[in-house]
Each structure stands twice: as C-alpha cells, then as structure tokens.
Amino acid sequence: NYSAKRKADSPFIGKTAYTWRMSEFKVSADNPNQADRSSERILLEFDWVNRKHNGGGLAFGPDGFLYVGVGDGGGVHGVPDIYVPPKTDTNDPNRHAEEIPEDPFSIPEQFHKYDLYAQDTKKLNGKILRIDVDHGHPGYAIPPTNIFRGKSEGRDEIYAWGFRNPFRLSFDRAGNGDFFVSGVAESFWETVYLIDRQGNYGWSIREGTHCYVRSRAFNPPKKCATHGSLGEKILSPIIEYPNWSVMRKESTVKAKPLGTANVGGFVYRGKALPSLYGKFVFGDFSSEIIRAIVCGYPHKHMAGTMERQ
C-alpha cells in the first residue's frame, strides 16, 4: 500500500518461524510499481503464536498516522504447529494431519488461552495499532492521544482492541472520515465495525453482539460480560450477519446464513453509481452478493443488496 509520500508498508511473516514483522520499503527507482528490497526499514516485529490471523489491514488515517490491524495470532483456529499430541510418534511426518483436529469448534482445551490475547492490552495481538511512521526513526513515534500512551494498563501503540483478525481497514476519504474495520467470524457472526472511538470491540468475550465461549460455541450463552477488564464498555459492530456454520446440525443458533467470510469494503465516492454514493460497499467470500449499508452509527441493517454482475 502506497501513501501519498510514495512509501510502502507491508506486514508479513518473516523468515524466522512465528515472527510478525512490519516493514517499510521505498519505491524502486527503476520501477514505480515495485519496492526496493534493499531499502527495508523494520518498523515493528515481535514473537507470533501461529501462521494464521496475522491481520494485515493497513491504512493512513486523515490524521496522517498509520493504522495497523493485527490479528489474535490464530493460536486456536488451527492449532499451532508446535503442538504434538500425547502418545504420538514424533518421527511421523503426517502426525499433525492425523491427530490434530481441523475443526475450530473442537480444539484441545490447553489452547483456549490464545482466545484471551485480543483482550490483553499488554499484548499487540488482536488490536488496531496507531503509530507515527514519519517520526521516531528507525522505528516509529506514538501519537499523543493513543489511549494507553504512558500508562501501565496497556501498550502505547494500541488504538482499539478486541479483534479476531482485522485484515481489512478503510477510511472514508470524504464526509467525516469514518474508519471501518471488517472481521471474519470464528464461529457464526461476520462483522463490520465503525471505529468511532478508542476502546474494546469485544472479541473473544463476544463475537459481534453475541456472547462467545469456545467450549460451547454451538450453544453460546445468552448473557456475558458487557465490560472489559479495565471497566470499559464493550463496543458493538455496525453490522453483523450469520455465516454457514449456523446450518451445522450441532448449532442452536437459528438464523439464515448470508455468506461464509466478510472480505471487507470501502465507502463508495465514485460517480458511476449514484445510488451507492456514501454507502459502505462490501463483499463476502462465497455468497456472490455485494452489499451496501448506510454509513453512520449505530445502523445495523443492510441498506440494500446487489447481485453480482
């Protein structure tokens, strides 16, 4: 992703196993469509749980700061490769495929702790970070209004927390500059968040507006915490919709599925489709439908749908 200053920032998993790294590259002098590999400036790196849920959403906000989506690490959704079940022949190259359950609803209990990372404000997992990449070289500076800046309760970089895998971020470049984060469900509920304030957006206490407990994912409780560990109110998405997991025979959630995985979107500001102007337009991985919602908080309804053309 290129900023107005022709920089490229891209998070990726480094060559060392389970390291999360975000680097800045300059544009190649020979090809404006390529990055100069030799120009790498490592902005941030830290140990990682697994090869999944890396996040990856990046966007420069109207304030000029870089917003970074960091996933929870996927330590539960797809058991970490470091796990070898008891009584397993460690010389068997197929041991993982044979003995580790692939179903995210059937994960060994010792790995449930990874669900808590997104709520832990001492960790960067499951967060939206906000950093100033134009200062603080060779790393970055912390914006003065970040919620935990200079406080012991959390990491300075954190802007918002409680996300499973915020892999798509976008700002409305007109209007109020609204900030949208799209999330993919762990169990049933796909979400879109309007980040209109710093705070706690729920995972893994909630999935969307619904209570979440991994040990009873098919039969989630009706009541759960409404506030986080710091006393903060848990904030809700502006939209959620059920995915195909609600159709599984074990599910007690009664809803009509509308897709498989929310892939994110943008506020439309073009001229070709006037009826969509100012609406947040987004897609789903499998439904073949593009949806649009009226921007604004706290609208939860889908304002309209369009079949794929």
Indicate residue ranges for each PLM-predicted region:
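Metzincin-family zinc-dependent endopeptidase catalytic domain
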Residues: 2, 24, 52-64
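Extracytoplasmic
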Residues: 17-22, 38, 53-55
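Short glycine-/Asp-/Thr-/Trp-enriched loop segments that recur within the blades
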Residues: 47-55, 159-161
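A well-ordered secondary-structure block
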Residues: 42-45
